[in-house]
């Protein structure tokens, strides 16, 4: 974290990042604990939505964010192909069980194991110690993250290929075989990806991402900094705060892209589960409004699931980007205390 040259800086209890900044063991513990919270939220919210689900009202007009995602993945259908929530409670309970496992593991890494991996007894773990101004260390860890993302993409593609996912074009679950190697098709959708209306193209894009991420991950793990580590390559800029700012930029950008996807695309976000497409409006800021009849909507202040998802994603993404700018400026050495001091001195001069 930025200390502005003060070696004895102290942080308040609310600055949670300061506890794990230079302690890789606790950093991992916080990641695992965060995973547990996500699992608990997913499992608990799914049970909450399932208990209130009314089959006489369209799913997109109810509180159905988690149910809609499961339905899109082809889960919750009976043998006749009708969505009844079959097996959804089991999935939710498994998430709650795993949340307890993740929570216990997070506490173990935080309280029982070595807070700094470079002091640990296992030689392999020392490679994952945190050295924020060491590009070789950061690229090694980045490589593993990319491989995990690539594997997740493969799982999704294989799920669609063997189990099948919901195709709104025919109103039922079907298996999807991606066009492996059809990179031209993927490349051709750089600017019109919001209009994709084929699940084969969606899965081909995920297969392409898997290839790029796993290849990039292997590259980052196997390679090191070429030549001298100069200021042009980031010397003096790499820090915990800089990495935090880039992470915020990434998640903010993904949230904004997801908002546009959800608002307009009815192949990835079917009308059957999310409600009708939205219209983009402009007021103090951009926002989306429902275009269909939502008089029967029972949640989200009378709006559809699609409207709730799109608007919340957009505004969260916007504020994540602001957080990116804040932390990026701090990482570059900008002292916001000078702004406060300048405003205070200006006010004193005017008075």
Curated annotation (Swiss-Prot):
<comment type="similarity">
    <text>Belongs to the PsbB/PsbC family. IsiA/Pcb subfamily.</text>
</comment>
<feature type="transmembrane region" description="Helical">
    <location>
        <begin position="140"/>
        <end position="160"/>
    </location>
</feature>
<feature type="transmembrane region" description="Helical">
    <location>
        <begin position="202"/>
        <end position="222"/>
    </location>
</feature>
<keyword id="KW-0603">Photosystem I</keyword>
<keyword id="KW-0148">Chlorophyll</keyword>
<dbReference type="GO" id="GO:0009522">
    <property type="term" value="C:photosystem I"/>
</dbReference>
<dbReference type="GO" id="GO:0009767">
    <property type="term" value="P:photosynthetic electron transport chain"/>
</dbReference>
<keyword id="KW-0472">Membrane</keyword>
<dbReference type="InterPro" id="IPR000932">
    <property type="entry name" value="PS_antenna-like"/>
</dbReference>
<dbReference type="GO" id="GO:0009523">
    <property type="term" value="C:photosystem II"/>
</dbReference>
<keyword id="KW-0157">Chromophore</keyword>
<dbReference type="Pfam" id="PF00421">
    <property type="entry name" value="PSII"/>
</dbReference>
<dbReference type="GO" id="GO:0031676">
    <property type="term" value="C:plasma membrane-derived thylakoid membrane"/>
</dbReference>
<comment type="subunit">
    <text>The antenna complex consists of divinyl chlorophylls (a and b) and divinyl chlorophyll a/b binding proteins and binds more divinyl chlorophyll b than does the antenna complex from high-light-adapted Prochlorococcus.</text>
</comment>
<keyword id="KW-0793">Thylakoid</keyword>
<keyword id="KW-0604">Photosystem II</keyword>
<protein>
    <recommendedName>
        <fullName>Divinyl chlorophyll a/b light-harvesting protein PcbC</fullName>
    </recommendedName>
</protein>
<comment type="function">
    <text>The antenna complex functions as a light receptor, it captures and delivers excitation energy to photosystems II and I. The Prochlorales pcb genes are not related to higher plant LHCs.</text>
</comment>
<feature type="transmembrane region" description="Helical">
    <location>
        <begin position="81"/>
        <end position="101"/>
    </location>
</feature>
<keyword id="KW-0602">Photosynthesis</keyword>
<dbReference type="InterPro" id="IPR036001">
    <property type="entry name" value="PS_II_antenna-like_sf"/>
</dbReference>
<feature type="transmembrane region" description="Helical">
    <location>
        <begin position="27"/>
        <end position="47"/>
    </location>
</feature>
<keyword id="KW-0812">Transmembrane</keyword>
<feature type="transmembrane region" description="Helical">
    <location>
        <begin position="309"/>
        <end position="329"/>
    </location>
</feature>
<dbReference type="GO" id="GO:0016168">
    <property type="term" value="F:chlorophyll binding"/>
</dbReference>
<feature type="transmembrane region" description="Helical">
    <location>
        <begin position="242"/>
        <end position="262"/>
    </location>
</feature>
<keyword id="KW-1133">Transmembrane helix</keyword>
């Amino acid at each position: 974290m930025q200390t502005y040259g003060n070696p004895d800086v102290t942080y308040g209890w609310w600055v949670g990042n300061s506890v794990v900044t230079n302690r890789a063991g606790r950093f991992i513990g916080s990641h695992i604990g965060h995973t547990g919270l996500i699992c608990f939220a997913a499992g608990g919210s799914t049970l909450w939505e399932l208990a209130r689900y009314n089959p006489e009202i369209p799913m997109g007009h109810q509180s159905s964010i988690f149910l809609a995602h499961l339905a899109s993945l082809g889960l919750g259908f009976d043998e006749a192909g009708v969505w009844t929530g079959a097996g959804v409670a089991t999935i939710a309970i498994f998430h709650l069980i795993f949340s307890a496992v993740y929570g216990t593991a997070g506490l173990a890494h935080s309280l029982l194991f070595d807070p700094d991996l470079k002091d640990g007894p296992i030689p392999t773990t020392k490679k994952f110690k945190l050295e924020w101004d060491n590009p070789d260390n950061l690229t090694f860890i980045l490589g593993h993250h990319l491989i995990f993302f690539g594997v997740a993409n493969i799982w999704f593609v294989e799920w669609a290929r063997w189990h099948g996912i919901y195709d709104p074009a025919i109103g039922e679950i079907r298996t999807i075989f991606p066009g492996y190697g059809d990179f031209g098709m993927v490349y051709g959708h750089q600017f019109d990806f919001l209009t994709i209306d084929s699940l084969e193209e969606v899965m081909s894009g995920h297969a392409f991402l898997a290839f790029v991420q796993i290849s990039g991950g292997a590259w980052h793990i196997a390679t090191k900094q070429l030549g001298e580590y100069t200021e042009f390559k980031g010397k003096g800029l790499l820090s915990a705060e800089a990495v935090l700012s880039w992470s915020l930029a990434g998640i903010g950008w993904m949230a904004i892209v997801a908002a546009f996807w959800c608002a307009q695309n009815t192949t990835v976000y079917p009308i059957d589960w999310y409600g009708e497409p939205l219209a983009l409006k402009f007021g103090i800021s951009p926002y989306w409004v429902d275009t269909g009849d939502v008089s029967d909507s029972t949640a989200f202040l009378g709006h559809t699931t699609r409207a709730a998802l799109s608007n919340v994603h957009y505004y969260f993404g916007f504020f994540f980007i602001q957080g990116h700018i804040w932390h990026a400026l701090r990482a570059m050495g900008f002292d916001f205390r000078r702004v406060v001091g300048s405003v205070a001195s200006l006010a004193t001069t005017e008075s």
